[in-house]
From Swiss-Prot:
This is Toxin Tst3. The modification Cysteine amide is found at residue 62. SMART domains: Knot1. It comes from Tityus stigmurus. Expressed by the venom gland.
Amino acid sequence: KKDGYPVEYDNCAYICWNYDNAYCDKLCKDKKADSGYCYWAHITCYCYGLPDSEPTKTNGKCKS
């Protein structure tokens, strides 16, 4: 397992407007993570305990 920012197909992290921790927790759990929250500094979801196979944010550009 690993911790990190889950990404969509285009290497873009999931935005959590209004710092919605419940949204991120559900999103992370839907991806088989243990839990998640909205990281306020980046307004993106961060997950704990993601499966190693789940893609996470790298240094590559977001292609949106």
